[in-house]
Curated annotation (Swiss-Prot):
Residues 213-403 form the GMPS ATP-PPase domain. It catalyses: XMP + L-glutamine + ATP + H2O = GMP + L-glutamate + AMP + diphosphate + 2 H(+). It comes from Borrelia garinii subsp. bavariensis (strain ATCC BAA-2496 / DSM 23469 / PBi). The active site is at C99 (nucleophile), H186, E188. This is GMP synthase [glutamine-hydrolyzing].
């Protein structure tokens, strides 16, 4: 009776979502495809991402208000470049092409795309032409946008007009009669000025969409899906103490109660005193936490390993080994839950394998292909800021919810090169000093992520009258909304001076401290 009721509820929810007019994102492999969906969901409109090769018949059966063609790593003239059925443009549904999507529109309609003599990556200034278009309604004549392209439009197709340009390329085109639009830049990226307004113009003024999506209703759906999928089976979850795994744990607990078993694996690669902080969660949130000290095993497996991808794979494999040993003690454990989020999935690989892999994430790229446990990832379609909002709704305290992210592989990917116990000890002390000073100076919650990287580079120094030859540490602090793009944090010089002085004087093994001032893109937040 209970499960019949749940199935009925899910049927109602699925029927509701099928009847909602959605914005459809056709994914051509861009690292930002899901971010487009995030931006539009943020303004209250249901958005779905599907592979570009989805059959036209399926698309016709969807209730769509508008279609967005994402960017992608390919050139439209490359062999086997992703393409599109021209019938898409005969559905009388507005279409917006972004970057590769715009170039594909130009090619399909008979225009010309060529290789740039000057590629554009990063910030550029855009200028609007004196052409009336709803796409740029209520926008100034010039503003900053984010570019990321190696090809450009050389000749626009017949019946299209140019809406905007930069000093190097045609930045936007449109066919107003057919409601087909193109942008060479990325409005979905937070550092593109007025990007949200451009998307709002497309969604509300051109597609005539209505607000129909809320985070709260989506969370309720996820809880019911967990109940239906897991049933009476048990779920095992690796609890790291980070925001993602804690929110994941409380969501699953809400769905299956005592059938959730949280496992805290001490890998020896954690922040200083991390084990004590995580075990405190047991009492704060009434979680069933099993503690396992596997620090020696992890360190032995990482011996002589320098390649970051190999380190991630080894750690992921050993995590699964630990969990599967636990399941031998309880045959009713059938699922391995992870706090995988959208940005993890995007940076590892696109679901359709069209995107260029940046790096594998421990949650998605570090697990072995064959394992007995089934995977449960209730957060893998949410971005970090959405997860924080879910955490607020679940009653998670500020100090737990706004802790700076910590990667699954831990300090192994903040120690560049081989991992040793000596390096772990050095890095733990250095990161602890940085965190202490951030709290002391009321800066911790002003920064989204702060950590220290230990380089495999030694340099000469002088302490007292003695020559030193020790490691170099790099401080990395960033601010970001969604972790898809990020800017380095401009910290006060006096603060940096204090942190540097403390690390060099208090941490044996470091005699030089640098500050990383690179943004994402082109850099990633973590070094490995």
């Amino acid at each position: 009776m209970k499960y019949a009721l749940i199935r009925k509820l899910l049927f109602v929810l699925r029927t509701y979502m099928m009847n909602v007019r959605a914005i459809l994102v056709l994914d051509f492999g861009s690292q930002y495809s899901q971010l487009i969906a995030r931006r539009i969901r943020e303004i209250g409109v249901y958005t779905k991402v599907i592979p570009y090769y989805t059959p036209l018949k399926e698309i016709k059966n969807m209730n769509i208000a508008g279609i967005i063609l994402s960017g992608g790593p390919a050139s439209v003239y490359a062999k086997d470049a992703p393409t599109l059925n021209m019938e898409i443009f005969n559905l009388k549904i507005p279409v917006l092409g972004i970057c590769y999507g715009m170039q594909l529109i130009v090619k399909l309609f008979g225009g010309l795309v060529s290789k740039d003599y000057k590629q554009e990556y990063g910030s550029s200034e855009i200028f609007l032409k004196n052409e009336k278009s709803l796409l740029f309604s209520e926008l100034p004549n010039k503003f900053q946008i984010i570019m990321s392209h190696g090809d450009s439009i050389e000749k626009i197709p017949n019946n299209f007009k140019q809406l905007a340009f930069t000093k190097n390329c045609i930045a936007s085109i449109s066919n107003e009669d057919q409601k087909i639009y193109g942008l060479q830049f990325h409005p979905e990226v937070t550092h593109s000025e007025f990007g949200d307004q451009i998307l709002k113009n497309f969604v509300f003024k051109i597609c005539q969409s209505q607000t129909n999506w809320s985070l709260e209703s989506n969370v309720e759906t996820i809880v019911e899906k967990i109940k239906l999928k897991v049933g009476s089976k048990k779920v095992i979850l690796g609890l790291s103490g980070g925001t993602d795994s804690l929110v994941c744990a409380l969501l699953i607990k809400k769905a299956i109660k005592e059938n959730l078993i949280c496992v805290f694996v001490n890998t020896g690669l954690l922040r200083k005193n991390e084990d004590k902080k995580i075990l405190e969660l047991k009492h704060q949130y009434d979680l069933n936490i099993k503690y396992i000290d596997a620090s020696e095993k992890f360190l032995n497996y990482l011996k002589n390993i320098s390649d970051p991808e190999e380190k991630r794979k080894i750690i992921g494999k050993e995590f699964v080994n630990v969990f599967e040993k636990i399941t031998l003690e309880d045959q009713n454990i059938e699922y391995l839950a992870q706090g995988t989020i959208y940005s993890d999935v995007i940076e590892s690989k696109s679901k359709n394998n069209a995107s260029s892999k940046i790096k594998s994430h421990h949650n998605v790229g570090g697990l072995p292909d064959k394992m007995r446990l089934k995977l449960l990832e209730p957060l893998n379609e949410f971005f970090k800021d959405e997860i924080i909002q879910i955490g607020i709704n679940l009653g998670i305290k500020k100090e737990a919810l706004y802790r700076h992210p910590f990667p699954g592989p831990g300090l192994a990917i903040r120690i560049i090169g081989e991992v040793t116990q000596e390096k772990i000890n050095i890095l733990q002390e250095a990161e602890n000093i940085l965190t202490e000073e951030l709290f002391t100076n009321d800066l911790y919650y002003e920064i989204r992520q702060a950590f220290v990287v230990l380089l495999p580079v030694k340099s000469v120094g002088v302490m007292g009258d003695q020559r030193t030859y020790e490691y170099t540490a790099v401080i990395r602090c960033v601010n970001t909304q969604d972790f898809m793009t990020a800017e380095w944090t401009e910290l006060p010089y006096n603060f940096l001076r204090k942190v540097s002085s403390r690390i060099i004087n208090e941490v044996r093994g470091i005699n030089r401290v640098c500050y990383d001032i690179s943004s994402k893109p082109p850099s990633t937040i973590e070094w490995e």
